[in-house]
């Protein structure tokens, strides 16, 4: 009997905690919902949105495996867009994936400078919510784990410190 009461209590608490959760699906985020997330509302991701993210990611990997040039994955970014970073040769081996990780780490380090006052955390949460919802459209080719991490960070109150001048752009951090 105690277990049943505890389970019912846990379900009630979980339901109450998620009663005000905003479900993101990549299609219809309202200003009201976006500001609710900025103020601390938790988020959930609609399953169909994660399916789109997975399909998009699979498409990018298939293109890379077939020797297609993929911006930021098989070729550089910015002025290095014409520079081949790695060759998939029909297969994304552990070596190719490691080379891609090294490239991305190097890119992040080269962009890791910023200045100015720190952006209000609510505005950062707002930007994170909008970015997550955009990723859920399924057009970016991003790894599904990136979308999951955005949701986890929002739900756990993990908010990056973002200086207002010279910060890295969102397109530089999604692949």
Q: Can you say where each PLM-predicted feature lies in the sequence?
A:
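N-terminal signal peptide c-region/cleavage motif recognized by signal peptidases
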Residues: 16-19
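Bacterial N-terminal signal peptides that target proteins for export
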Residues: 1-8
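Conserved, well-structured ligand/cofactor-binding cores
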Residues: 21-175
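A glycine-rich, hydrophobic loop/mini-helix early in the fold
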Residues: 13
């Amino acid at each position: 009997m105690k277990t049943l009461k505890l389970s019912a209590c846990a379900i009630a608490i979980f339901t109450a905690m998620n009663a005000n959760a905003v479900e993101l699906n990549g299609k219809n985020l309202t200003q009201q919902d976006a500001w609710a997330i900025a103020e601390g509302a938790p988020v959930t991701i609609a399953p169909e949105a994660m399916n789109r993210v997975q399909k998009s990611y699979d498409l990018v990997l298939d293109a890379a495996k077939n020797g297609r040039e993929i911006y930021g994955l098989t070729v550089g970014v910015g002025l290095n867009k014409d520079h081949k970073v790695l060759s998939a040769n029909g297969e994304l081996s552990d070596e190719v994936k490691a080379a891609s990780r090294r490239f991305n780490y190097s890119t992040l380090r080269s962009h890791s400078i910023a200045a100015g006052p720190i952006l209000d955390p609510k505005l950062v949460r707002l930007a994170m919510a909008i970015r997550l919802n955009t990723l859920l459209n399924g057009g970016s080719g991003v790894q599904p784990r990136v979308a999951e991490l955005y949701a986890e960070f929002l739900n756990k109150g993990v908010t990056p410190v973002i200086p207002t001048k010279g910060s890295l752009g969102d397109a530089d951090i999604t692949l």
